[in-house]
């Protein structure tokens, strides 16, 4: 049975859901259903261990990533359908993109695109974040060279560092053939 809809409204940056739990007509906090007067928190919870573990806040979560033949907007990435066209040897551009949530202050993202021979085609390092970012879209790419994109596997590497430490890394690729991509 459908309970409601999840979506964007107002100035929100990502779909989210507000949940109210009621007990005997009163709203209760499911994370601290019976707080002690004057206490900042309680270990009591309405969640079983499995649910509590699933609800833990996760930092730096990869939502999706891919390759395109053009720079995509956040809206386009959010609405991509399975089987969207991938770059071919004659695509106007080759663009790698990554959508993340939960980035933290001090995070620096770097996205690097490598050609089939391993050379760096494009690289972008974003400045360190001054505050947490609910959602981000990173893109890197190049326009097609005159003879077209050489056939082979193109690799993108996305990395986040914070305080000099790598805190997240992901590599993905697409194979570009003379007539069509092969994932």
Language-model segments: which ranges?
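A short tyrosine-centered beta-strand micro-motif
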Residues: 150-161
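Acidic, glycine-rich catalytic/binding loops that coordinate metals and/or anionic ligands
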Residues: 12-97, 104-105, 114
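Short beta-strand/loop motifs in extracellular/secreted proteins, especially
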Residues: 107-109
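Short beta-strand elements
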Residues: 165-183
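Solvent-exposed serine/threonine-rich low-complexity stretches and specific carbohydrate-binding patches
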Residues: 121-132
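Aromatic sugar-binding surface patches on proteins
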Residues: 130-144
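Short hydrophobic beta/alpha edge segments that flank linear recognition/processing sites
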Residues: 1-12
């Amino acid at each position: 049975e459908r309970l409601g809809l999840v979506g964007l409204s107002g100035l929100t940056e990502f779909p989210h859901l507000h949940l109210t739990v009621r007990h005997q007509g009163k709203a209760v906090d499911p994370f601290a259903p019976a707080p002690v007067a004057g206490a900042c928190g309680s270990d009591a919870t309405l969640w079983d261990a499995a649910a509590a573990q699933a609800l833990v806040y996760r930092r730096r979560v990869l939502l999706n990533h891919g390759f395109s033949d053009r720079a995509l907007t956040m809206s386009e990435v959010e609405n991509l359908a399975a089987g969207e066209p991938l770059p071919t040897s004659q695509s106007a551009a080759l663009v790698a993109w990554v959508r993340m949530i939960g980035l933290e202050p001090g995070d620096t993202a770097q996205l690097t695109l490598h050609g089939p021979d391993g050379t760096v085609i494009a690289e972008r390092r974003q400045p360190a974040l001054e505050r947490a970012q609910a959602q981000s879209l990173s893109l890197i790419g190049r326009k097609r060279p005159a003879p077209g994109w050489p056939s082979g596997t193109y690799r993108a590497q996305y990395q986040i560092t914070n305080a000099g430490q790598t805190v997240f890394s992901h590599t993905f690729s697409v194979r570009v053939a003379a007539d069509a991509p092969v994932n």
